[in-house]
């Protein structure tokens, strides 16, 4: 439908590039045998975008798309083990639409953008979409399985099929270049990638439950509730375990859930208005005041 929006009025070379972005839910009738949890679903959400530009702008626009990927994956989500795959057509021309010149131009535009980006990439023959070359973002799970997280295409056929044009400086109608990008791919699928990439041990800022308050007994309940309210007031995702179970069992179960920080509260902590901190992977961090604990995690609670 963004093609229809683009077509809704005449476009000049001065208007380009035009970028449309949206969050949209897509539905596909996948066969039941191919469905696989969050990795392959019948309904999924994407941060979809289409960029309409002149051919001489396409390289720079594609470069910016690659930089956006690098920002999301490395700086926000901390994914280091990845590479880009430039997917090319096979030698069997019957499987791909368009003419060789169009393919060659599109491939060279993407190839130059990839080289300028500095990102590691390989070229894979026969992996292109039927309508144009693409760049696939390949990541590995914690067990080394490789998956495609997102795909970005330079679609030169859309201009023909949907009559997407602009007027150049001489008033001549020319086909526009269309870049399709979805940096996170399917959000449901990307969540599955994150779970596998981190093996469930999410960084603090991403963890569904960041802090678990563990009460040793009923007598410390009021102090635990006070701590919980203060943590939540600070916009931290905190929970309280005040079940009638041993503290050892509570700690084991919380560690199995891979919660980043546990605050163990007993009579001593209640009396001194402190918290006993346990950090995932590091164990006991000692007793400290709540403010000192909050200062300690201040940087970790935000993407680095």
Label every model-predicted segment.
Residues 1-304:
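NTP/phosphate- and nucleic-acid-binding module
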């Amino acid at each position: 439908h963004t093609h229809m929006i683009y077509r809704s009025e005449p476009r000049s070379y001065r208007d380009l590039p035009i970028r449309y972005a949206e969050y949209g839910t897509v539905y596909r009738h996948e066969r039941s045998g191919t469905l696989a949890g969050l990795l392959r679903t019948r309904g999924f959400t994407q941060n979809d975008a289409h960029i309409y530009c002149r051919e001489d702008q396409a390289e720079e626009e594609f470069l910016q798309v690659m930089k956006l990927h690098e920002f999301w994956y490395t700086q926000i989500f901390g994914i280091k083990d990845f590479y880009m795959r430039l997917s090319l057509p096979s030698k069997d021309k019957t499987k791909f639409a368009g003419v060789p010149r169009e393919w060659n131009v599109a491939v060279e535009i993407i190839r130059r953008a990839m080289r300028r980006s500095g990102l590691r990439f390989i070229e894979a023959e026969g992996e292109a979409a039927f309508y144009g070359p693409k760049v696939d973002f390949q990541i590995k799970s914690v067990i080394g399985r490789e998956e495609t997280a997102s795909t970005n295409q330079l679609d030169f056929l859309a201009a023909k099929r949907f009559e997407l044009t602009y007027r150049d400086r001489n008033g001549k109608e020319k086909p526009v270049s269309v870049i399709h990008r979805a940096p996170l791919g399917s959000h449901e699928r990307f969540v599955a990638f994150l779970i596998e990439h981190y093996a469930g041990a999410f960084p603090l800022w991403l963890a569904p439950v960041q802090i678990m308050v563990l009460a040793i007994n009923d007598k410390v309940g009021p102090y635990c509730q006070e701590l919980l309210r203060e943590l939540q007031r600070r916009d931290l995702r905190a929970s309280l375990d005040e079940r009638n179970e041993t503290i050892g069992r509570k700690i084991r179960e919380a560690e199995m859930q891979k919660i980043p920080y546990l605050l163990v509260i007993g009579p001593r902590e209640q009396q001194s208005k402190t918290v006993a901190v346990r950090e995932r992977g590091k164990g006991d961090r000692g007793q400290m005041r709540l403010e000192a604990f909050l200062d300690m995690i201040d940087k970790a609670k935000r993407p680095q």
